[in-house]
Amino acid sequence: MEEAELLKERLQAITNKRKIQEDIAQRRIQIEEEKLKLHHLKKKALREKWLLDGLSTLSSEEQEDMLRQTQADQQQIKHLESSTDRLEQEIDGLEKEELQVSTKEVCVLQRLKSVERTTEDIIKAVKAEVREEPVHDIYAGIPDLPASYKPFFVKRMESATQEDGEEPRKALFAMEIKVEKDIKSGKSTVLSTIPVPSSEFEDAGVKVYDDGRKSIYALKSEGRGTQNGVDTLAPVEVEDLLRKATEKRSESPTEYHEPVFSNAYGSTQKGYISPRMNGHNSPHSENGVTQNGIVNKEALPCPTVPREVSRIKGPFPEESNISHNQPSMETQAEEPMADHTEHQPTVQRNHYKEIPNNLGDYNPDFSSLNLEEDMHYNVVHATPCCTDDSEPVTMIFMGYKHADDGDVKPISDYEGIIRAELVVIDDDDDDDDDEEADKKGEENTKESVSVSPIIRNQVITSSKIQDSIKKPTNQNITLNNQLPYKNSMSLQEQEASLGYNSFPIPNKQIVEDGTEDPSLTALRIRMAKLGRKVI
């Protein structure tokens, strides 16, 4: 009660103090207004007095009026001065009263502080009055399951296993799941899943779940032990964990692919040569070829891609065993050439032999350096794979060079040498020349010709043939002892007759970057310059 009364007294004192302050402010405003009026009247009185002193021509009535006006102004000035003094006295009285009210307020505040209780006292009193009651959990009455508790179906499966006498089954599949658990929220997040081989899986860690079909073991993280022990997992938690692991694995599956190179045709794998190059086969890919170099016809697959050419050493004693689908490209040299071969034993070894079925003999003496040096396009590649031995082979004359018997330079130095038993020079413009060339070709069935379109030279060892080829500029070379074509065949007809649709010939070879092979481009330009009937 005392505290309430003191609070009322303090509130009343504050209210009175506020009113006194408002009265003081109003009176001060009035004093300012009175002072302004007083100042104005004094100035007016001095002006009129100055006018009266300077004007002596006024009548008596006017002078009387001026005197009465001056007296009225003097009275008003006195009244304003007295009013100002009174207001100042009232302000002084109000200020004294305000001081008394402030003093009374301070006294009431001191008494109130002595009587009023602090916040801590109030809290203590409230706590003393209110009794604390213990919180009752709804699950407090349910006892916790013991660690040795097992579900009924687990016990039944164990008992059935014991009765049957079967040994414990081995794990068929194992997976390592890395889980991060938030202590505050209790949520588990699957970070990664790693399949583990069941043969390498060992029962490590603490078993937290086992229902006879699935077993879960808790492992310690790297460098840290488990916090507050390990609790067993409920079946619901296990299913949720497996579901999250499955989702995590399906989000970013592991994909395997072959190595990708920035330049597909600029670098090859070790021990492998691209089939678009010179066609040297790896010894591991030579299926259907015996150790003696004999090709088995049944083991030869049907080529579905552009054929390769295998480079093997000559001579070839087993040439008769090779499939008849390939043209015979070996040349029977004359006696002078044989003598030259005896002096130069390396000439025959540098020759090429064509095998159209992408197979060939592999010689260990064949160094990898020679394979890398001869990776560009060769004229031997241009021979189709489906030619018949009974049909003549038409070739394009690109130039010639004399090859004397005593020439010290071996003809094998020229790239793409082809040896033929019969060479017939045909001129389409003159039928008589065709017959003469045919006769001359029959008389010289053992002549040796070396053709190299890539280097734009043709080596012919027979002097008779040298005389006959000086005249024409557009000629065809026919092999295998057959009559030449009377009329030149078009490129499309020749491709159709040689099975172009099934086996593409190398003169249509396109590089992987979309451009034609440079050697083929040069060959086409040279053909265009020879005349209108060049194949």
Curated annotation (Swiss-Prot):
Q: Mostly located where? A: cytoplasm
State the coiled-coil residue ranges: 1-105
Query: What domain of life?
Result: Eukaryota
Q: Name one GO cellular component term.
A: cytoplasm
Family that this chain belongs to:
Belongs to the paralemmin family.
- Record-given protein name: Palmdelphin
Q: Where is this chain compositionally biased, Acidic residues type? A: 424-436
Per UniProt, which keywords does this protein have? Cell projection, Coiled coil, Cytoplasm, Synapse
Q: Which InterPro entries match?
A: Paralemmin
Query: Where found?
Result: Cytoplasm; Cell projection, Dendrite; Cell projection, Dendritic spine
Which residue ranges run through the membrane?
Answer: none
Query: Could you tell me where the Basic and acidic residues compositional bias lies?
Result: 437-446
Pfam families named in the record:
Paralemmin
Q: Which GO terms describe its biological process?
A: regulation of cell shape
Record the organism.
Xenopus laevis (African clawed frog)
- Annotated segments matching region Disordered: 423-450
